[in-house]
């Protein structure tokens, strides 16, 4: 296991070397990870929106965004600026308090979930021992905001969209949690860092995708449903509900929903990479690479290179999954609401439960391979 680089310790030592007391150095560090997280999540949304528009254009034999910056890279920024500057309209008969709180309750838990995401051994905001439990708890808050937004709009399409969104989120949260618990069982920990470390040592052969072939499929399907991506975009089906729970929203409040959907997609892809694709781990073990080049793995400059490339590996795996999600938008049709709920309750839930029981049995029978 690569011990990695302690960014917090390095930052505090560097600041102390400038004559600043230790307490002040720690106080300077505290807001820094949060600001980096907010900035990184926002930039990732801009990248994903640009990718979606370009890939969608390619699927339809169009060019897509082209003139707003090189290759249209500034088009998402222009979209965001337009939404921020638009008038914030509240329907006359809407419940103004719930109408305002709804988007915030949807977006804030998604951003807080980034707290547990590791990009390296010490490259995360906080390594809480109950990281997976915290993520599941935060994700369970989102349906409340969706239902509040649909109800508060005083619009039949918004209400139906909110009810659909809440039902869909609750239906797929259980299979999602059970598939993740199988990984937690093998790792003997709820920490995302420990889950990645459990996959280290054997390169690509040690990744959980091989030990959880059913679990990773369940996780991906449930994650797409939680993100309301096609074929599971029932809450905002344009042909049926105009825009679902977002129908009456405009300006900054609509921008929060727009931002939250893409932040959630990026979060799901990053979690998939951490849980099943080894996170920052290379397809070839780091010990093998250091042996081939004849440099000890503990060498500081080599650790710095590994940490930098490790961030790239995590993002590469995540963006590959995002590419698949965008591609699915143009290759599969939308399911009906009854098919959606049947898939969640009658198929994914029992299969994920059986997968968890089988994982427990394999853990007892083959403790070395399944983390006994």
From Swiss-Prot:
Q: Which reaction does it catalyse?
A: a plastoquinone + NADH + (n+1) H(+)(in) = a plastoquinol + NAD(+) + n H(+)(out); a plastoquinone + NADPH + (n+1) H(+)(in) = a plastoquinol + NADP(+) + n H(+)(out)
- A GO biological process held by the record: aerobic respiration
Alphabetical UniProt keywords: Membrane, NAD, NADP, Plastoquinone, Quinone, Thylakoid, Translocase, Transmembrane, Transmembrane helix
Q: Name one GO cellular component term.
A: plasma membrane-derived thylakoid membrane
> EC no.?
7.1.1.-
Keyword Nucleotide-binding present in the record's keywords: the answer is no
Quote any Pfam family the record assigns: NADHdh
The cross-references to PROSITE patterns, in alphabetical order and at most eight, read: COMPLEX1_ND1_1, COMPLEX1_ND1_2
Please name the top-level EC class of this enzyme: translocase
Chief place of localization? membrane
Molecular-function GO term, any one? oxidoreductase activity, acting on NAD(P)H, quinone or similar compound as acceptor
**Membrane-traversing stretches:** 31-51, 65-85, 97-117, 128-148, 176-196, 254-276, 304-324, 347-367
Tell me the superkingdom of the source: Bacteria
Its quaternary organisation is: NDH-1 is composed of at least 11 different subunits.
Identify the PANTHER family for this entry: NADH DEHYDROGENASE SUBUNIT 1, NADH-UBIQUINONE OXIDOREDUCTASE CHAIN 1
Q: What does this protein do?
A: NDH-1 shuttles electrons from an unknown electron donor, via FMN and iron-sulfur (Fe-S) centers, to quinones in the respiratory and/or the photosynthetic chain. The immediate electron acceptor for the enzyme in this species is believed to be plastoquinone. Couples the redox reaction to proton translocation, and thus conserves the redox energy in a proton gradient.
This one is known as: NAD(P)H-quinone oxidoreductase subunit 1
Gene source species: Leptolyngbya boryana (Plectonema boryanum)
**Gene responsible for this protein:** ndhA
């Amino acid at each position: 296991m690569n011990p990695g680089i302690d960014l917090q310790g390095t930052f505090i030592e560097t600041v102390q070397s400038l004559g600043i007391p230790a307490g002040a150095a720690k106080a300077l560090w505290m807001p820094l990870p949060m600001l980096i997280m907010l900035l990184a999540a926002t930039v990732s949304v801009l990248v994903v929106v640009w990718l979606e528009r370009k890939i969608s254009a390619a699927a339809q034999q169009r060019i897509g965004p082209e003139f707003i910056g090189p290759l249209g890279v500034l088009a998402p920024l222009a979209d965001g600026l337009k939404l921020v500057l638009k008038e914030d309209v509240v329907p006359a008969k809407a419940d103004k308090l719930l109408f305002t709180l709804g988007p915030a309750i949807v977006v804030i838990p998604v951003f807080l979930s980034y707290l547990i995401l590791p990009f390296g051994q010490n490259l995360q905001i906080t390594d809480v021992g109950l990281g997976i439990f915290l993520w599941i708890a935060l994700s369970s808050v989102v349906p409340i905001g969706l239902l509040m937004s649909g109800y508060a709009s005083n619009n039949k399409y918004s209400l139906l969209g909110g009810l659909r969104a809440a039902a869909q989120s609750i239906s797929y949260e259980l299979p999602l949690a059970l598939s993740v618990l199988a990984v937690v069982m093998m790792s003997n920990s709820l920490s995302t860092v420990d889950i990645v470390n459990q996959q280290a040592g054997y390169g690509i052969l040690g990744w959980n995708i091989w030990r959880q072939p059913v679990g990773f499929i369940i996780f991906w399907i449930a994650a797409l449903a939680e993100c309301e991506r096609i074929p599971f975009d029932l809450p905002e089906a344009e042909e049926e509900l105009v825009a679902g729970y977002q129908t009456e929203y405009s300006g900054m409040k609509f921008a929060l929903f727009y931002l939250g959907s893409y932040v959630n997609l990026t979060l799901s892809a990053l979690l998939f990479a951490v849980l099943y694709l080894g996170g920052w781990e290379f397809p070839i073990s780091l010990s093998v690479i250091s042996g081939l080049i004849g440099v000890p793995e503990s060498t500081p400059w080599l650790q710095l290179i590994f940490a930098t490339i490790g961030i790239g590996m995590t993002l590469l795996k995540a963006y590959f999954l995002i590419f698949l999600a965008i591609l699915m938008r143009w290759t599969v049709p939308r399911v009906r609401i009854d098919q959606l709920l049947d898939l969640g309750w009658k198929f994914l839930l029992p299969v994920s439960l059986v997968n968890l029981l089988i994982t427990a049995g394999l853990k007892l029978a083959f403790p070395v391979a399944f983390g006994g």
